[in-house]
Every structure is written in C-alpha cells, then in structure tokens.
Amino acid sequence: MAISIHPPRDPNTLSNYNNWICTHITANFDILFDQKKLVGNVIHKLKSTTNGESQEIILDSNHVAIGDVKIDGRPSEWELLPPLEPYGSALKIKLDQGVNLNETIDVEISVQTTEKCTALQWLTPAQTSNKKHPYMFSQCQAIHARSIFPCQDTPDVKSTIDFNISSPLPVIASGLPVRDALGASKSEGKSLYQFHQRVPIPSYLFALASGDISEAAIGPRSVVATSPDKVQECQWELEADTEKFIGAIEKIVYPYAWGEYNVLILPPSFPYGGMENPIFTFATPSIISKDRENIDVIAHELAHSWSGNLVTNASWEHFWLNEGWTTYLERRILAAVHGEAYRHFSAIIGWKALTDSVEHFGHDHEFTKLITDLKGKDPDDAFSSIPYEKGFNFLFHLETLVGKQKFDRFIPHYFTVFKGKSLDSYEFKATLLDFFGTDAEASKLLNDLDWDTWFYAPGLPPKPQFDTSLVDVVYELAQKWKSLSETSSFKPQLSDIESLSANQIVVFLEQMLLLERPLTPELSKLMGEVYGLSKSENIEVANLYFQLGLKAGDENVVDPATELLGRIGRMKFVRPLFRSLQRVNREVAVATFEKYKDFYHPICRAMVEKDLFGKRDV
C-alpha cells in the first residue's frame, strides 16, 4: 500500500499528515543556557485518518537529536530518512499494525536541540538591555519548528499544546500562563513554568522565550513582558492603545478568542520587527519610541489573532491569506482609531514597499505572484512585502468592487466559516462567491473579475485610487527643502512639522533621501536643529535623519549615529546606517562595528560584516 510522503496541499512538509492528524502536543523541556540547548520530550496525540491503512508515521525533523520513541508507552522502531534539503531528515516511526479511523495513539519522543537548530536564538548577557543574564527566544515561522522537535511542521495541521518548561529564568510561551503555578519551585535553581494553549494552533506558532523578564499591565486583558529596567517605559508606550485596538477589531470581525493579548518586548539585539505568536506577540524594542507613534506593528500582530492564527493559510504558497488579510485588518484598526485618511496613508507607504519588493525580485519573478510555487523551495526565500501588500491591494480591490458596506458583512462570515481551520486561495474564492451568490449585482462583478490575473500574474497589480491628503502635505514640504539648495524664500521652522505624525515625518525624510543632489551639511544641521530630529527618541525618525545627514556629509550626525548603532540591533536600521556611515567615514564605521559586534545577533553581525568587508571569516 502506497504511503504518500508529499500530501496534496503543502509541498514544504515531509510528514504524512494526510494519514495522521496531530490533535494535541505536550512539550516538556529543560532550558540549558550553559549548553545552549533544550532537552526533554514531546508527546503527540495522533488521530488516524485512514482505516488501519497506514502502518508508519512520518514527522518533519531537522538537526534534532532523538533519544527514543514510544507508541502508547511501548518502545517503537524508528529511523531518520536521508536529508532532503531544505526540509531536513524526516523521522519515520514503524507501527506494529494500523489504527482504526479516528482512533488516537500517543507518540512520545525524547529529544535534544543541537547547535544547528534554526529556530532558537541564544543571546549573551551583552546582547540584552541590562547586560545581566542570558536570553533565549524562538522563531519557528516558516518551517523551523522541526528543528526543536519532530512534528507535522505544516500550517495545514493544528493542535492544542501544553507547555511544561523548566528554566533558571522566567519563561514566556504561546499559551495561557498558569499564573498560580508560574515559577513553582524545582531543584537545582530551576523553576517549572506551565502554559496551556486551548485553541488549536499550527506548529509555526509554537513559541518559547526565557530571560530576565518582568510584566506590567497594559489593559484589562493584556500585559507587557520585558527586561525589568524597561518595563515602565514599555507599559507607558502600549497602555493607551492596546485595548483600543482590540475593541476596534472586535467590532470589525468578532470577539477575541484567546483570553489574554500580551506583548513580549525582546532584547534590543532582536534583528526583526515582530512575530504573531498567540497570547504573546514577540516584538522589537524599536517600537518603544516614547511618543506612541511606532505601534502600528501591534495593530498588525494583534490582527493576526484572527487572520493567520485562527484562520490559517493551508500552505506557504497561499501566504497572502495570512499576511494580506492581516495588513487589511491592521489598516481597518488604524482607520477606526485615527480616521479613514490614515488607512490610505498607510496603504500608500505599503505601495512603496510593494514596488521596492517587485524591483528587488524582478517584475516577472515567481515570488511576485499572489500564489507562489514553492515546491522544493524554502518558504523563507520567498519572504517579502509582496504577500502583505499585494494581498492587501487584492482585498482592498474586492472591498471597492462590491462596496465597503457589503464587504464588511463578508468579513465576520469568512472568519466564522474557517475559524480553527486552514484554507487555500480557491476555498477563499468559493466562499466569497457563495456569500454574494444571492446579490445579483455583487455576484456579477465578482464572477467577471479576472481571478487568474490576480492569483498568478507576476509584478504589480493595478494601483488603486488612494486618498493622498496625508502625503500631499509631506511632499510639499520636501519640495520646499529641495528649493533651498537653489534660491528660495522658504524659512524652515518647527511649525512645519508640528502637526505631522511620526510616520509622516518618516515619509518626508524618505523623500529627502531620494534627492539626486544631497543637502549641504549646513542644511542638514539646520533641519536637525529646527525640527529636533537629531534628538528624536523615535528610532524610525532618527535612523532616517542620520542617513540623510551622513549623505550630506554632516559631521554633526556621526556621534549620535554611532550611539544609536550601540543600542539597537534591528537589521532594518543597522544595515543602512552602517552603509551610510562607511561612505562618510569608513574608519569610524569599522571601529563602531568592532565595538558593538558582540551586541548584535549573529544573523545581523554576519550581514553587516558582508556590508563592510565583503566576504571574510566572521
């Protein structure tokens, strides 16, 4: 009897999840900071989806050390299949006999992570904000959970999870914390931390972090967790908007399903923006800007609590169903809080990111399509703003086509039909057409839509008509500055930007960076002084102003730029700032890198090495 290793919907898993479905995972791990590994076991409850026809279980696994495997408590035969890159070496477990349809078995696997684990990052005390303790966090999206423990590593399977984690330092996981048992004492200086995830989630949302972590309330159902020295400023940054955001999206979709919505602010060397791990969003500290203006990322990660986490793409080929929907809902939250013009402003910024990504890949590249072909490919290689922004523009087009009022009725319907499930683009299309089937006008418009072009054509989609009111004022200001390098009566003053949001100032600075002829050092200094940009606590703003000043050859920004490089490790800021700095003063750039390289995450450090030195041994 043939067992298919490649199930029909997800080409990026080696598991035979068409024969078995994991319904529950118990994860028991010790965090060993000195050895930089997790040691323990996982128990999978697997339900048979055939009537005794499958006599083997195949799980994804990559660079994990497996001790033994038991089926319902009895030792079982197992082997690791030859590696098939980039998917790892599948774990094949033999059964003595098949299992009846819908009956379950428990598969217990003792496991250790190895130094080749791609999901876990281990930070030294030097890479944290108060420099006192080591830190560990996971990032399992897209196919990295299999490097922590063997599993059905596909978004097409969802399981409930119990976490039992021992660590000498506080632990965060993607489940509801058992707060009365948190840190229950255990021997050898370790405590046991327990979390329960009662909503079934895919493997990529399995998340762990451990380090010197404190918590503070930011709403009636929310806490922020971060380093004790940063907890108050993080609380201030997030407490004004978090519950407001939750209330806004609950009106658009339906009530929040996860109990608590919390935010873990990671150490400053975290190289990314954010990750939507359920119950605890993992976020970059660069959103803590002391002006509450960088928290759009929280609206985005919160929106994932519906799109992605509850209703999930069946494979990474349909990633737009996660990210396009989430970007659409994020902007609906922003519209509810800041007004409709702000949604369009955010979409205009997104359109620029989309055009940049299409330019990067090339207009006819496979990865610029809404539905991508990822057979034999690593989903991480396809990652870009395209599923976010092309996906958003498709949904915005559908909203415009049928009318916002009608589309608003479809939103909760869609998220109800697929709640707790995974779907592909074809099911999305069928559900949309079915919902509007009794509305002759909307039905005709949707049936006449060129679905194949939207789904399969590479490159940019048609550009929508956006409300440009919030960018027009910014473009006008940029034009005035451009005229200063010629002859102009324009006299810059603080009132030019007093009514602008931080995001508008970001767009203004991006426009200034596009000037063919850079500002003079004098004008750069004038801008920094008059607008207060040189002292901005908002890293999005400060980073761009320093790039602008360096491009202008303004020596006044060198010191603050190097100081910024010593306190943030997000690659979005670090790489362009080093590139700008080395063009002005390579000696300072190299010295700054040597001074702070141990602070940076290894991925960031390697990238900056390449930027500064080309290829050399790290």
Swiss-Prot record:
Co-factor: note: Binds 1 zinc ion per subunit.
GO MF terms, alphabetically ordered: aminopeptidase activity; epoxide hydrolase activity; metallopeptidase activity; zinc ion binding
Chief place of localization: cytoplasm
Enzyme class: hydrolase
Keyword Magnesium set for record: no
UniProt keyword list: Cytoplasm, Hydrolase, Metal-binding, Metalloprotease, Nucleus, Protease, Zinc
Localization terms from the record: Cytoplasm; Nucleus
Cofactors that this protein relies on: Zn(2+)
PANTHER family assigned to the protein according to its UniProt record, in alphabetical order: LEUKOTRIENE A-4 HYDROLASE
Function field: Aminopeptidase that preferentially cleaves di- and tripeptides. Also has low epoxide hydrolase activity (in vitro). Can hydrolyze the epoxide leukotriene LTA(4) but it forms preferentially 5,6-dihydroxy-7,9,11,14-eicosatetraenoic acid rather than the cytokine leukotriene B(4) as the product compared to the homologous mammalian enzyme (in vitro).
Name of the featured protein: Leucine aminopeptidase 2
